[in-house]
Structure formats: C-alpha cells, structure tokens
Amino acid sequence: MYMKNIFRIILLLTTMLFVSCGDDDEVKLPDTKDVNYANIAGSWRLSEWNGKNLEGDTRYYYITFDRKEKDGKRSYTIYTNLNSATSEQIPGSFLLSKEDDYGDIISGTYYYQLDTDDEWEYSYIVSGLTDTSMIWTAKEDMGEMKVYTRCNEVPADIIAGTRASF
C-alpha cells in the first residue's frame, strides 16, 4: 500500500511537470507574406537603416510602389531629404525576382541619369515581409540593411515638398 501511494505521487508529479512545460515561452513570429507585387504595393517609410532607428529624425525616406504594370514596367516614387536639405521626389521602376542562393530580390532603376548609372546601387534581398514591415538586405553588401514600415500614405507636405528639414 505504501509503495502504491509513492508510485501515485511520482506519477502525479511527473504529469504536473509535463503539463506545466507548455509552449507559452516561445516567441511567436508574425506570419510572413509572399514577396510579390501585390504584397509590397503601397507606401513604406524607412524606419531603420543599418541598425539606426530613424523614428523622430527630421530626415525621411518614403517609397511608394505601384503594382500595376505600365509599358512593361512597374513604377515607384521615392520622397526623401536624406541627401538634400530640401525634399526630393525620385521616380523609377522596380523588378522583383527570385534567386536560388538569395531568395526574393528587389532591384530598381531611377528615371533620371546619375553620375554613374541609373540603376540602384544595390539589389536587395527582401525578407520578413508582413502587413506592417519588411527588411531589405543588400545582396552585394550584407551589412547594408533597411527596415521599412508600411504607412497609409506619404504625408502631403512631403509630397508637396514643403516640409522643413529642421
């Protein structure tokens, strides 16, 4: 009888141990979306660049993607003051592709001629695409990383070019 009670207590404690070991402590990552023209369409704000949070910074960088193809290309417009004291509006076209070694890639072309050429400096690996954010990592320089946060629209004063940079 004494052995039966000890056995029952051990069985009860073992059961309690397994019941208390749930998955509650696991970090649940948000569901990621497929990287396609429909899922990245819309307006995005650069919120982090190479580990530096840009929240509250007077500098800004917005990019709006149009998923509809026109003349064989899909367009984007950048609104930024990162390289200038005034607001710049930079149009261009972009392309999504998939590479065996890197996965989903976004690359682009500016619609005006730069000093070197009119292609983006880097092609970017797109990862972690959710309803609210996505991460770009430069394929040619893995230390170059950008985090974009989805926004409803680019602020009107930025589109108009009237936002002060200080």
Regions found by a protein language model. Name each.
Residues 4-12:
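Sec-dependent signal peptide recognition
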Residues 28-45, 166:
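N-terminal helix-cap/turn-to-beta initiation motif at the start of protein domains
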Residues 46, 96, 124-128:
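A structural signal for short, hydrophobic beta-strand segments that form beta-sheets
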Residues 17-20:
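C-terminal motif of bacterial Sec signal peptides marking the signal peptidase cleavage site
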Residues 55-106:
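N-terminal glycine/threonine-rich, aromatic-flanked beta-hairpin/loop signature
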Residues 23, 29, 89-96, 100, ...:
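Edge beta-strand at a domain terminus
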Residues 102-126:
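An anionic, turn-rich surface loop/hairpin at beta-sheet edges
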Residues 128-134:
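Ser/Thr- and Asn-enriched, surface-exposed coil loops between beta-strands
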